[in-house]
Amino acid sequence: MTVLQEPVQAAIWQALNHYAYRDAVFLAERLYAEVHSEEALFLLATCYYRSGKAYKAYRLLKGHSCTTPQCKYLLAKCCVDLSKLAEGEQILSGGVFNKQKSHDDIVTEFGDSACFTLSLLGHVYCKTDRLAKGSECYQKSLSLNPFLWSPFESLCEIGEKPDPDQTFKLTSLQNFSSCLPNSCTTLVSNHSLSHRQPETVLTETPQDTIELNRLNLESSNSKYSLNTDSSVSYIDSAVISPDTVPLGTGTSILSKQVQNKPKTGRSLLGGPAALSPLTPSFGILPLETPSPGDGSYLQNYTNTSSVIDVPPTGAPSKKSVARIGQTGTKSVFSQSGNSREVTPILVAQTQSSGPQTSTTPQVLSPTITSPPNALPRRSSRLFTSDSSTTKENSKKLKMKFPPKIPNRKTKSKTNKGGITQPNINDSLEITKLDSSIISEGKISTITPQIQAFNLQKAAAEGLMSLLREMGKGYLALCSYNCKEAINILSHLPSHHYNTGWVLCQIGRAYFELSEYMQAERIFSEVRRIENYRVEGMEIYSTTLWHLQKDVALSVLSKDLTDMDKNSPEAWCAAGNCFSLQREHDIAIKFFQRAIQVDPNYAYAYTLLGHEFVLTEELDKALACFRNAIRVNPRHYNAWYGLGMIYYKQEKFSLAEMHFQKALDINPQSSVLLCHIGVVQHALKKSEKALDTLNKAIVIDPKNPLCKFHRASVLFANEKYKSALQELEELKQIVPKESLVYFLIGKVYKKLGQTHLALMNFSWAMDLDPKGANNQIKEAIDKRYLPDDEEPITQEEQIMGTDESQESSMTDADDTQLHAAESDEF
């Protein structure tokens, strides 16, 4: 028995769209066994890839010569997923053995898929440290399709500064049209018509969801060719032969359910359902909020307008359900194989859960207006193609109706109780068309086309405006202009602001500013509104680590690991949880697990490096930080970690170099400037160190670490009065920090005011008798202080000589304060 290719393809896509991957794979394998074509090969590989079997798709495509752009792109995608970057590059751009393809060559070869192809190629270039080429590919991809976000995101992450105003714009009609699907929905809104002429709203049948289970394929005594008449091979996906359209209850577009859909779900692109219709996101007023699973709201409008003339409800039509104007066309349910002049369209069923008011589908008859070179949608090729024709004498497909509707072999009639004149007047306006225009296959649709295009353009421009604002905020964040990023993102519309992605970026910005309380507040809101979000939670876990909130951190790590054990963010949170409990060995295992889950996750390498520093395994820590830099050269946290190790090893020149490298990436970090100042002071560059610390304090005037180090440098340079003034200001910021009082006591002793010195030494000892609860050390990073190491107590320091006091300040306090900031980043 010959397999019908098109129905099987539609069934496969339906299974894929309903996530029935096993069924899709099985059917695709059967189809490929029957028809060894490029299309069947691509469909089978797609099923493998979507079911998570990229290696199967790779081997399948690799074993066959891929000549179509779709197969090439999918094979390259599999190569990238399997870390075969060189092979993927050769497929997309030619590689070493073939001529290198230019961007124009790629656009010519891949057509509408060129924007995605260039984005994938840019990813390959960036992974192989060819950032300039990668940047060019990303920029070209955005110029072809400004609706893409990931290329812009990647440009920002590699250090480029794309202009959102120039990136997210519709430069031309061609640019706009290339981003639209081949088939769109039609919306004709003409309020100037009489109320007696209801408006017709046409929605296409959902793509690739033809209900094949309602088709009764009669194969006995008949043979079906794989294709039908080539004259209708380019029609829209909703235009299906009447013999093949499954009928069901509630399909009439004249039902009130079109207007009375339940208003559920978010509005366009994430707006809440309660959003006022007077404040649309993208420049147009939403006609109705889609129900969950209803994709018609995001579909564009076609350039054709199809209208019908409804017969009187009291006298059901004997020939058809709906007629075109006054012409005597053949019945839309005619069983003749010769009726090819007019191909009817079945309007998509409404998804309303309310009572059905119509039991007979309304069939519209549009003209074929798609261009000859337009590719039909997958669902439209159910029984249409251009390679062969259906025999006129072949038996037609028989409809299987729902149980409530008897299977009629005669022409369908309008149910008297299904449609009433008030229903028509309340819901739709119908325009009658001249029969001569219909017979010629032409419909005057200039006005509806203009209206539809204007609506499309307004919606697209609204989206571009939103992407521009979000792009500016993300660019500022990647440039570490955190305050600017917070300001931009905070001014987004409330329904976009209150989403997980936006709030995570704001929380990350607060984290980079060391405003951990604000960051914790933002991330907790993310957890409230999107408790399924994993991205960004590694920053949240580090924020909780800084705030010493062990209970909240434990709850977070438990929830994340239960939700997704294949997420590196979850294991990073678990590692931070045990690190806070000083269970460093367990924390190391969890960070290693995060790396095992995602070897390209730079932050896991950084956290693992900090844990190795705590266990004094500096060589392993160096290897971790270097791996983080290998994965992401702009990961300044790893450069900082290397600098800290070299500082601990008293390799101050190397430490300064690595700190400076981190500062080049994040020039707004007061903490990095502070560390550079400390290293410069260790290199006997005291004046330069003071200038650096002054810059750090300008960026963050209330940073206690910077002020403490500046006071220490002033004290070392014998500028006691200036040091004392600095410490008095610092005492107002951290009134319970014992080290501040201890340094004040040392200053007073140098000034000869012994009684004041003893008083401050006593206060320092009262605040921290064992020297183990210093806020500055803990807030910055107590991880660099081994568990069994206790700071020199104030009593020991008071009893020692001046030289021993200075040494203890430098070795015990100063070094720990500077060198212990790993999770500041």
Curated annotation (Swiss-Prot):
Residues 349-362 have a biased composition (Low complexity). The keyword Phosphoprotein applies. Residues 396-414 have a biased composition (Basic residues). It comes from the Eukaryota. Pfam families: ANAPC3, TPR_1, TPR_8. It is found in: Nucleus; Cytoplasm, Cytoskeleton, Spindle. Pathway: Protein modification; protein ubiquitination. Homodimer. The mammalian APC/C is composed at least of 14 distinct subunits ANAPC1, ANAPC2, CDC27/APC3, ANAPC4, ANAPC5, CDC16/APC6, ANAPC7, CDC23/APC8, ANAPC10, ANAPC11, CDC26/APC12, ANAPC13, ANAPC15 and ANAPC16 that assemble into a complex of at least 19 chains with a combined molecular mass of around 1.2 MDa; APC/C interacts with FZR1 and FBXO5. Interacts with RB. Interacts with FAM168B/MANI. Interacts with MCPH1. Belongs to the APC3/CDC27 family. This is Cell division cycle protein 27 homolog.
